UniProtKB/Swiss-Prot annotation:
Belongs to the AAE transporter (TC 2.A.81) family. YbjL subfamily. The keyword Chaperone does not apply. Keywords: Cell membrane, Membrane, Repeat, Transmembrane, Transmembrane helix, Transport. This is Putative transport protein YbjL.
């Protein structure tokens, strides 16, 4: 039996879509030196090649893909979005605005200089910034702009063409810039990271190992009684001196949970909870021949939970003010916008931050109730909330503003982005509402993006040969300029206007570009994870601003003549 593959694919949109996705994802795993192509560019290249062979796909699939993607971007940004406006993130907000705003203005200028249409210009901006949200925002605004169908088709084809031609240029140039730009300034990143570490008492090690606390029991002997010198536990400050916390005492056969007024006596058996290295550093008066193995004394349930910061008595306060160790709990990680941050006593907590805390189950529960709630370890998505806010986003996108003879609509991209932000924000405040497991959110976001990329590539593929010959050289120049010049402007603004620490500044710059590979290079150069503080500060707001930039470039373009 002979099978005509071309007819088979043309007659089955679903089969064609998944063939494009599979081939594109395989291509995306290839590396050019140290740079991996990535899923987005892999799917786009395959779809452009198949589009040249006149394969096509239903545009409804393209629309659904971009809607799912942009909605999930909003959900991820929601927990930290408003805190960047209203709290200590003003510097990060300004950096993100400078990065995105300068790129937008430069792209508009180059588009007019080279005589491109809005499709090529917006696509070049999206590719140079390696930002799919720009592409999504511009495409949606074009579809609702009311231009003639032939012009719209050409603009959408050029949009994906510009993106495809400049994406790798933007990615590679930023990675090279991240490697060499720190060497062109007077302060090296390692020194800057160490300076922040000294000021804030941080661990600068980018590969810090996280251990769980363990419990061991010791019998109080004459040396330990002499060491305490009759002081109670509060006066001794056992944790400050040893790094361990006395969780239980057995005295005269009776188990008790000690308070700060307890005084250790000869023959007491004490259960100490602490990290392994803290036990190893204990004074010999604790350890030498004094360890005991008492099933009841050691029978404690040490748990590790992820606590989401929510309550007003924790939001806006510094990490040190929580005094976790005073409550017998140990902090392992601080996570913001899915970025692990250095454990810094001076970090101001935002709503939606996640603290990974270990300790006795009852104590961890008490701490969680005080500062927020324990993250739900569920694999079930609240589909009702997901669908309801998706509908709200579509309805917001239908709103149109009229100014004399000029009108513009909010569009699906901005509407869904806003609805997603609200769902993420409400989820951070109400633990039982709108829960979406991170794995499920990542899957929907990635799948939506890949479907969108497949659609735009198949639509634009037929004209790529002509377009490449006409504007290829111009695209190379424009891509480099739009990728690197805003980074330099952002550096000068952060270094000499905001006077930011260089390690934090370079992390924030990579966050404003939403480029994780470049962030890894900055962390390696600094030999520290301290730049992650800056990356997390700009990442959430940059995703939103980039989507709006895609909308704005289409709205502004006709007014430039």
């Amino acid at each position: 039996m002979n099978i005509n593959v071309a007819d088979l694919l043309n007659g089955n949109y679903i089969l064609l879509l998944f063939v494009v996705l599979a081939l594109g994802l395989c291509l995306g795993k290839l590396r050019l030196g140290s740079v991996q192509l990535g899923n987005s560019i892999g799917v786009l290249v395959v779809s452009l090649l198949l589009g040249q062979q006149h394969f096509s796909i239903n545009t409804d699939a393209l629309n659904l893909g971009f809607m799912l993607f942009i909605f999930c971007v909003g959900v991820e940004a929601g927990p930290n979005f408003f805190s960047i406006f209203f709290r200590d993130g003003k510097n990060y907000l300004m950096l993100a605005l400078v990065m995105v705003g300068s790129a937008l203005l430069i792209a508009l200028g180059l588009g007019k200089l080279f005589g491109w249409d809005i499709g090529l210009t917006a696509g070049m901006l999206a590719g140079s910034m390696t930002s799919t949200p720009v592409l999504v925002g511009a495409g949606d605004t074009l579809r609702h702009s009311g231009i003639a169908s032939t012009q719209l088709s050409s603009a959408l084809d050029n949009l994906s063409l510009g993106y495809a031609l400049t994406y790798l240029i933007g990615l590679v140039s930023l990675i090279v810039g991240a490697r060499y730009l720190p060497k062109l300034q007077h302060q090296d990143l390692q020194t800057s990271a160490q300076q922040i570490a000294r000021e804030r008492g941080l661990d600068t090690d980018a590969n810090r190992k996280v251990y769980l606390p363990v419990i061991r029991a010791y019998r109080v002997g004459p040396e330990l009684v002499a060491w305490t010198d009759g002081k109670n536990l509060r006066e001794l400050g056992i944790y400050r001196q040893t790094g361990c916390y006395i969780e239980r005492i057995r005295r005269n056969g009776i188990l008790a949970n000690p308070d700060g007024d307890a005084v250790l006596q000869m023959g007491d058996e004490i259960a100490l909870v602490g990290y392994p290295d803290a036990h190893a550093r204990l004074d010999p008066s604790f350890r030498n021949g004094k360890e005991v193995f008492d099933r009841d004394l050691l029978d404690m349930r040490i748990v590790t939970e992820e606590i989401v910061v929510k309550n007003h008595n924790a939001v806006g306060r510094r990490l040190a003010q929580l005094k976790l160790t005073d409550h017998g709990c140990f902090l392992n990680r601080v996570i913001r916008s899915q970025i692990e941050m250095p454990i810094d006593d001076n970090v101001v907590l935002n709503k939606g931050d996640v603290l990974q805390v270990s300790g006795d189950a009852r104590r961890v529960k008490t701490i969680a109730d005080r500062i927020g709630f324990i993250s739900i370890h569920s694999q079930v998505t609240d589909l009702l909330a997901f669908c309801a806010f998706f509908i709200i986003g579509l309805m917001i996108g239908m709103i149109t503003f009229q100014f004399s003879n000029f009108s513009f609509g909010i569009g699906n991209a901005a509407g869904l982005l806003f609805a997603g932000i609200m769902l993420g924000f409400l989820r951070a405040n109400h633990p039982t509402f709108g829960y979406i497991p991170q794995g499920a959110l990542n899957m929907v976001k990635e799948f939506g993006l890949m479907v969108f990329m497949a659609g735009v590539g198949l639509s634009a593929g037929s004209g790529i040969s002509n377009g490449l010959g006409a504007v290829g050289g111009q695209m190379l120049i424009a891509g480099l300029v739009v990728s690197l010049v805003p980074v330099v402007i952002c550096f000068l603004f952060g270094a000499y206007v905001l006077r930011m620490n260089r390690a934090l500044l370079f992390g924030a710059m990579m966050g404003a570009r939403t480029c994780a590979p470049a962030m890894e290079i900055i962390s390696d150069t600094a030999r520290s994870n301290i730049p992650a503080l800056g990356y997390a500060g700009t990442y959430a707001i940059a995703n939103v601003l980039l989507t709006l930039a895609g909308t704005l470039i289409v709205i502004i373009w006709p007014g430039l003549g």
